[in-house]
Amino acid sequence: MLVPKRVKHRREFRGKMRGEAKGGKEVAFGEYGLQATTSHWITNRQIEAARIAMTRYMKRGGKVWIKIFPHKSYTAKAIGVRMGSGKGAPEGWVAPVKRGKVMFEVAGVSEEIAREALRLASHKLPVKCKFVKREAE
């Protein structure tokens, strides 16, 4: 699973996800991509589940690029603990994804296979997604 090797601060602020993604809105490496149409946090487990769903459908053919990385930690207090007495312990890692960001890219397979593989991956994610193609240069 994807986790940072080391971080400066273990506990981060939640932050706000306003507007669209600044970069990474076009398909850069592959031929086809999966673009987010809503903003959300995506956990490292969701990214891994989407990757497995894609590679299983493509039967190890083609190449997959994961263009998001879970660099932000999120915390949670234990169940049954009252409010107060500090921030909770780090629970996991998330990648904040804004709308318009291309999260996954695929190359080396036909469009039908890529479309279905990315559709299966989108079912594992908490964001609404759309299939995008690389623009002709």
UniProtKB/Swiss-Prot annotation:
SUPFAM superfamilies reported in the protein's UniProt record: Ribosomal protein L16p/L10e
CDD domains: Ribosomal_L16_L10e
GO molecular function, one term: rRNA binding
Pfam family, one: Ribosomal_L16
Keywords, comma-separated and alphabetical: Ribonucleoprotein, Ribosomal protein, RNA-binding, rRNA-binding, tRNA-binding
Keyword Metal-binding found: no
Gene3D superfamilies reported for this sequence: Ribosomal protein L10e/L16
The keyword Lipid metabolism is assigned to this record: no
GO biological process, one term: translation
Annotated GO CC locations: cytosolic large ribosomal subunit
Domain of life: Bacteria
InterPro entries: Ribosomal_uL16, Ribosomal_uL16_bact-type, Ribosomal_uL16_CS, Ribosomal_uL16_dom, Ribosomal_uL16_sf
Family according to the record: Belongs to the universal ribosomal protein uL16 family.
Free-text function comment from the UniProt entry: Binds 23S rRNA and is also seen to make contacts with the A and possibly P site tRNAs.
Summary of subunit composition and partner proteins: Part of the 50S ribosomal subunit.
Protein name according to UniProt: Large ribosomal subunit protein uL16
Native source species: Streptococcus sanguinis (strain SK36)
